[in-house]
Every structure is written in structure tokens, then in C-alpha cells.
Amino acid sequence: MAPGMRVCLLLLIAFTLLGPQRAAAFPAMPLSSLFANAVLRAQHLHQLVADTYKEFERTYIPEAQRHSIQSTQTAFCFSETIPAPTGKDEAQQRSDVELLRFSLLLIQSWLSPVQFLSRVFTNSLVFGTSDRVYEKLRDLEEGIQALMQELEDGSSRGGLVLKTTYDKFDTNLRSDEALLKNYGLLSCFKKDLHKAETYLRVMECRRFVESSCAF
């Protein structure tokens, strides 16, 4: 055998033996960890937005008007027009892929308007986190997309296509109309994140929790 061919053969054998070691050194993240990470991200973001909503309400919306305003806020929510499950029981009737697609749809509908949060609310109002909400949304979006790739075997199948998004938050806080608009948007944001969190928890529970899913 020629010296050059002998060297190539030895290198091929070496790389073949090294392959399993490299794979063991950099294992793929288990599906359970992907779900756990996505659920934690959704819970954190949902709580952040819920706190922001409460603080905005306390600061700008008179208590006597809150009930009447809240009863009409559903009209603001574009997500009410899509066939997404409205609660845990309905979510349990859908497949994991369906729930992931709905979750992604809800998250992506807020990517554009959320970029205006830091222009609307002072840091003290949202506990210095308004600039990070967009980043947290993107992190959650990536987590959901990673789950979809795992469950769909890496294929990019067609799903729901988002054609509508929410309006931008209004920066004119001296206007009553703008205040009500922002109040409604925050309410929808909170509701949509609650839905996404619920879907992710339902999926995680029925895959990895043996007892009943109590949440």
C-alpha cells in the first residue's frame, strides 16, 4: 500500500473512532429538557406581563372604571378570532404539534408591538424589564421552534400562517383613548401568554408526568 493511502486510511479510522466520543461529549438536549425550558420561559414571561398589567392598571385606570373596561377588552384581542383552545380542557383535546403551532402563532403576534414597550412605560413602572420583554419573547419563540423540529422530525411542514398582528402601544399617555388602548393591549398580551403557558404545560404533563396534571 502506498504511504499516502496508508495515512488516509489511518486518519479515516481515527475519525471513525472519535465520532462516538464527540457525540457523547456534546449530547443533544432531551425532549423533557426542551419542554421544561420552554415552560419556565413562558411562566416567567407571563408573570412579568401580569405584573406590568397590574401596575399599569393601578397607576392609570380608576378602580371604579376597571370592571366596565375589562368586560369590553376581549374585542381588542385578535387571538380570539383564531381556533385556539381557550383553556386546559380544550388544550388536552389537541395534538402536541397543534398546540405548539398555536403557541408560536400567539408569541409571534407580539414580536412587533412589544418593541415599543420601552418607549411607552418608564422603567419604574415595569420594574426595569421593558427592554428585555422582546428578548424573552424571542427566546420563547426559539424554544417552541426547537420543540416543533423535534416533534416533526426536523421537517418544516406547513402550519398556521400569521397574517395579523396587534397594534403598536401608544406613546401618548396623556390621552384617555391611548391609555385605554394600551390597557387593552396589555390585557390581551397577558391572556395570550397565559394560553401559551397552558398549552406548554399540558404537553409537558401528558408526556412526562404519570399522575394527574394539577395546575
UniProtKB/Swiss-Prot annotation:
The gene is GH1. This is Somatotropin. Belongs to the somatotropin/prolactin family. InterPro entries: 4_helix_cytokine-like_core, Somatotropin, Somatotropin/Prolactin, Somatotropin_CS. Keywords: Hormone, Metal-binding, Phosphoprotein, Secreted, Signal, Zinc. One of its GO terms (biological process) is animal organ development. It comes from Monodelphis domestica. PROSITE patterns: SOMATOTROPIN_1 (PS00266), SOMATOTROPIN_2 (PS00338). Disulfide bonds: none annotated. The modification Phosphoserine is found at residue 130. GO terms for cellular component: extracellular space. Plays an important role in growth control. Its major role in stimulating body growth is to stimulate the liver and other tissues to secrete IGF1. It stimulates both the differentiation and proliferation of myoblasts. It also stimulates amino acid uptake and protein synthesis in muscle and other tissues.
